[in-house]
Amino acid sequence: MEAVIEKECSALGGLFQTIISDMKGSYPVWEDFINKAGKLQSQLRTTVVAAAAFLDAFQKVADMATNTRGGTREIGSALTRMCMRHRSIEAKLRQFSSALIDCLINPLQEQMEEWKKVANQLDKDHAKEYKKARQEIKNKSSDTLKLQKKAKKVDAQGRGDIQPQLDSALQDVNDKYLLLEETEKQAVRKALIEERGRFCTFISMLRPVIEEEISMLGEITHLQTISEDLKSLTMDPHKLPSSSEQVILDLKGSDYSWSYQTPPSSPSTTMSRKSSVCSSLNSVNSSDSRSSGSHSHSPSSHYRYRSSNLAQQAPVRLSSVSSHDSGFISQDAFQSKSPSPMPPEAANQLSNGFSHCSLSSESHAGPVGAGPFPHCLPASRLLPRVTSVHLPDYAHYYTIGPGMFPSSQIPSWKDWAKPGPYDQPLVNTLQRRKEKREPDSNGGGPTTTGGPPAGAEEAQRPRSMTVSAATRPGEEMAACEELTLALSRGLQLDVQRSSRDSLQCSSGYSTQTTTPCCSEDTIPSQVSDYDYFSVSGDQEAEQQEFDKSSTIPRNSDISQSYRRMFQAKRPASTAGLPTTLGPAMVTPGVATIRRTPSTKPSVRRGTIGAGPIPIKTPVIPVKTPTVPDLPGVLPSPPDGPEERGEHSPESPSAGEGPQGVSNIPSSLWSGQAPVNPPLPGPKPSIPEEHRQAIPESEAEDQERDPPSATVSPGPIPESDPADLSPRESPQGEDMLNAIRRGVKLKKTTTNDRSAPRFS
């Protein structure tokens, strides 16, 4: 048993010694670790400094990317976020370096000294205990051997009292071996605990360092997200992103607003800007873009409606200021510009879409309510022209006469309640002129040679042949000379108007290639419903100066009423200033952009790509007599379009103008005067308001197409003596005087140019 115990104790002692030897042999490893950790911490400090400098430069790059106009704002933002994450990593790295030196290296160095002491102490304690135990066992074993020898001697002598002592000694030896074994086991445990404790201490020192490192490396996930963003932003370096395109659009929009916000505002600010940019392409597209298609009118409506049907281009005339919906489409104008399937005889049609009723005996034989609508105009004509045409509530197309056409043949325009900027104020006045002619048509005067029968020609009589029924054959030449004088004076005074009409409601941007001729510019001018005309020479110089610096519709009553008020305004545009004399056709200036063909010379801004506009010199009929009013007249020749509208709107027919006209204030007589001058005459069948419209209609009818009548082929028939009225002699002179006096407008009480009022 002693040998077994000895063997076990030797094994335990050997294990202890091995453990102690391992612990003592681990010191160089720990020391090397501490050394390398110190070097790492030193490098981390250097890295932190270098990282700080690197991130400063990185931030500058990110700021540059953010502030660059090359469309890298998103890239700069992502780089800034990445830089911020790297800043955070830098801070974590600082903390990691501090933890490495404070929590691992320095404590481990201190612990190494303790570990060495503990290992040495364990080895000493074990050696001491083992030596003591072995000494006791040896002593007991020695005593036991002595007792055994003594016992043998006693047995040989026959004595038996020594045996119990021997047994006790052997037990003591066994106990000592057991104690030694236990001592060895304890020593081994202590050695194992010490060795394990060292690693536990090391882990406790390493944990703060690892935690700081984990916190630092936790920023990697954010870097991964930012890296994906940068990858998507820089996927295609040769393609501009939407933000870069927006930069270009912003710059373009800024330049555009800078270019087009310079002109002053017109009276109607909403229509001025639009109409100024959209006011001139129609003169290049020489067609009446509103003269095709069908028109349907509600019987209860007093407004003119225009469909949006696009007209084809007619190649005959170039239109800058021609009257496209001045009330009637003259024969020559129809032949040159209307692409609709109507025959050339369909001249007696209102430009507001109504078919002008037949002037044959059948038409005016009916009652007033059922006859052609020129018979009975409502009393609303005495009011200022709020609606361009106040029509009575008649049937849809009235009585069917030779001049009637289906709705598909009636020219129509867009559904606007106001006339276009090139409208002539002839809608109502020409109706009254027709009204005046109806009794003459009933008189059955001789028809023109080569013309259709009287009844059919009355219905199809071109309105361009505006003649006076009150002119005697002997007075034709004198009246024509007076008319020519008035027209010549009016043409000289209307120097500005050829460009005014094309630039109606324009604030300066009126090039001919600005907008298409069918642009849906449907903004009506609120200041163009009152058009007053003047051929008085003393007002025209002042008017020219005013028109150069005003963006009000040039020929409206507003512009004349406020003429002196706006003389100090700066010029809105020099595009409309004329360089040559030319006749003018005054229009009710709505911001429309469709124009009918006209050869009227107009001074316009040169086209960007279309070249100069062909301009015809106006022809003034000086020696040609005016045809008297007849029941039927031949259609105007093809040269009518060139001469139509070359007279001032104020030009009256020769010999027309009643005796009472001279007594009427000139402010009450104009193309669109609120109250038309009364015309006392011997025709009781015509109501008073219709007689009032006669001189006005004659004047504007003559203005519409007088030359076409004068150049009509064939003999000029003389009017029937039954058709002559007693107001023949002084009519032309009084009318010319009224025209020369011009129009005097009443003062208004408001400064609002877009909403004039007349007291």
UniProtKB/Swiss-Prot annotation:
Q: Which residues form the WH2 domain?
A: 731-748
The GO annotation for biological process reads: actin filament organization; actin filament polymerization; adherens junction maintenance; bone mineralization; cellular response to fluid shear stress; epithelial cell proliferation involved in renal tubule morphogenesis; glomerulus morphogenesis; in utero embryonic development
InterPro entries reported in the protein's UniProt record: AH/BAR_dom_sf, I-BAR_dom, MTSS1/MTSS2, WH2_dom
Please give one Gene Ontology molecular function term for this protein. signaling receptor binding
Q: Where is the composition biased (Low complexity)?
A: 612-627
Q: Please give the SUPFAM superfamilies that the UniProt record associates with this protein.
A: BAR/IMD domain-like
Q: Which GO CC annotations does the UniProt entry carry?
A: actin cytoskeleton; adherens junction; cytoplasm
Q: What is the effect of changing K746A?
A: Loss of actin-binding
Q: Where is the composition biased (Polar residues)?
A: 660-670
Which keywords does the record carry?
A: Actin-binding, Coiled coil, Cytoplasm, Cytoskeleton, Phosphoprotein
What is the tissue specificity? Strongly expressed in the developing neurons and skeletal and cardiac muscles in embryos. Strongly expressed also in liver, outer layers of the kidney, and in the Purkinje cells of the brain.
Q: Where is this region: Disordered?
A: 259-309, 331-354, 431-472, 569-759
* Pfam families assigned to the protein according to its UniProt record, in alphabetical order: IMD, WH2
Task: List the coiled-coil residues.
Answer: 108-157
User: What mutagenesis or variant effect is reported for K747A?
Assistant: Loss of actin-binding
Location(s), subcellular: Cytoplasm, Cytoskeleton
Q: Where is the composition biased (Pro residues)?
A: 675-685
In this protein, which residues make up the domain named IMD?
Answer: 1-254
Residue(s) carrying Phosphoserine: S265, S266, S275, S326, S648, S651
Q: Which Gene3D superfamilies match?
A: Arfaptin homology (AH) domain/BAR domain
List residues modified as Phosphothreonine: T262, T429, T607
Its domain description in UniProt is: The WH2 motif at the C-terminus binds to actin monomers.
- What's the family? Belongs to the MTSS family.
Q: What does this protein do?
A: Inhibits the nucleation of actin filaments in vitro.
The name this protein goes by in its record? Protein MTSS 1
Lineage, highest ranks first:
Eukaryota, Metazoa, Chordata, Craniata, Vertebrata
